[in-house]
Amino acid sequence: MAIGLEHYLTVAAILFTLGIFGIFLNRKNVIVILMSIELMLLAVNINLVAFSTHLGDLAGQVFALFVLTVAAAEAAIGLAILVVFFRNRGSIAVEDINMMKG
């Protein structure tokens, strides 16, 4: 039995749904929200690679590499901001971040 396109799409849909549930069910911790967003980006990348392979076009795979690069940079910058915020405020709760004043 070969693994077809529908298997990849099913896995990607499950990962995307888990990411959405992670955002909606845990609104108190910023790190969990960032991890859920990364899980959703991973699901999108799986879709890009699956469709790219199915259609025989490399554009989707190249675009997935760019998305992974940007997602890694976004995660690094987001975590660095959270570390600085935790050092200054002592908490990374979403309520505390919403109270920031410019």
Swiss-Prot record:
What GO annotations for molecular function exist for this entry?
NADH:ubiquinone reductase (non-electrogenic) activity; quinone binding
Q: Where in the cell is it found?
A: Cell inner membrane
Gene Ontology CC entries for this record? NADH dehydrogenase complex; plasma membrane
| Class in the EC hierarchy, top level | translocase
Could you list this entry's UniProt keywords, alphabetically sorted: Cell inner membrane, Cell membrane, Membrane, NAD, Quinone, Translocase, Transmembrane, Transmembrane helix, Transport, Ubiquinone
Which parts pass through the membrane?
5-25, 31-51, 66-86
**Which GO biological process categories is it annotated with?**
ATP synthesis coupled electron transport
Tell me the subunit arrangement: NDH-1 is composed of 14 different subunits. Subunits NuoA, H, J, K, L, M, N constitute the membrane sector of the complex.
Which family is this protein grouped under? Answer: Belongs to the complex I subunit 4L family.
List the HAMAP family hit by this protein, alphabetically: NDH1_NuoK (MF_01456)
Query: What is the annotated role of this protein in its UniProt record?
Result: NDH-1 shuttles electrons from NADH, via FMN and iron-sulfur (Fe-S) centers, to quinones in the respiratory chain. The immediate electron acceptor for the enzyme in this species is believed to be ubiquinone. Couples the redox reaction to proton translocation (for every two electrons transferred, four hydrogen ions are translocated across the cytoplasmic membrane), and thus conserves the redox energy in a proton gradient.
Q: What is this protein called?
A: NADH-quinone oxidoreductase subunit K
Q: Which organism is it from?
A: Parvibaculum lavamentivorans (strain DS-1 / DSM 13023 / NCIMB 13966)
Could you tell me the gene encoding this protein? Answer: nuoK
